């Protein structure tokens, strides 16, 4: 595996997140319903758009991402973002799964007033993202400011018929979390 510096890996990861989660049309690629993009076409379109992207760099980002944001298809010809999509091109069919008793959501303190009014909503994404542990939720919340960890009564939600899914990178997903299922 070729050597890349941390900035190059982080910049490429952000670029891939933008294109594979939110705006594939920004470089002229089309994702299938499961979010897959042909790697050769992705690299070519990225280069035409002025982004330095090679197969080796892409593979390094996939292999070294601590959050496992991306995955290769079984034949190695395609790549996708595992979760976090806002583009209408993608509707990944996750298998429904029974959650643990509690899940966690990391946010910034400045969002608490709104969350107390409406609960957790997906916003522009397809799902609300939840963590299985407080440490991961804290890291997520810290990206947005002073972190606050909310506890989600996940099993109680599931018992009331609210579905949960788990992405292959371990992130838990649900459509919304009503205020009654949150602990501050």
From Swiss-Prot:
It comes from the Bacteria. It is an enzyme of class 2 (transferase). Its EC number is 2.7.1.-. Pfam families: PTS_2-RNA (PF01885). Signal peptide: none annotated. Disulfide bonds: none annotated. GO terms for molecular function: NAD+ poly-ADP-ribosyltransferase activity; tRNA 2'-phosphotransferase activity. Keywords: NAD, Transferase. InterPro entries: Ptrans_KptA/Tpt1, RNA_2'-PTrans_C, RNA_2'-PTrans_KptA, RNA_2'-PTrans_N. GO terms for biological process: tRNA splicing, via endonucleolytic cleavage and ligation. Belongs to the KptA/TPT1 family. Removes the 2'-phosphate from RNA via an intermediate in which the phosphate is ADP-ribosylated by NAD followed by a presumed transesterification to release the RNA and generate ADP-ribose 1''-2''-cyclic phosphate (APPR>P). May function as an ADP-ribosylase. This is Probable RNA 2'-phosphotransferase. It comes from Escherichia coli O8 (strain IAI1). The lineage of its organism: Bacteria, Pseudomonadati, Pseudomonadota, Gammaproteobacteria, Enterobacterales. The gene is kptA.
């Amino acid at each position: 595996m070729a050597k890349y510096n941390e900035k190059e890996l982080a910049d490429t990861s952000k670029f891939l997140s933008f294109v594979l989660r939110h705006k594939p049309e920004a470089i002229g690629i089309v994702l299938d319903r499961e979010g897959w993009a042909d790697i050769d076409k992705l690299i070519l379109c990225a280069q035409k758009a002025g982004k330095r992207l090679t197969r080796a760099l892409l593979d390094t980002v996939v292999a070294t991402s601590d959050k496992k944001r991306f995955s290769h298809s079984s034949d190695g010809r395609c790549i996708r973002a595992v979760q976090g999509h806002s583009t209408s091109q993608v509707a990944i069919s996750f298998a429904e799964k029974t959650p643990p008793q509690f899940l966690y959501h990391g946010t910034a303190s400045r969002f608490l007033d709104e969350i107390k009014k409406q609960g957790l909503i997906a916003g522009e994404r397809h799902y609300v993202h939840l963590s299985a542990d407080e440490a991961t939720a804290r890291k997520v919340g810290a990206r947005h400011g002073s972190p606050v960890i909310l506890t989600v009564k996940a099993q109680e939600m599931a018992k009331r018929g609210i579905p949960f899914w788990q992405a292959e990178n371990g992130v838990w997903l649900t459509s919304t979390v009503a205020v009654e299922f949150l602990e501050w």
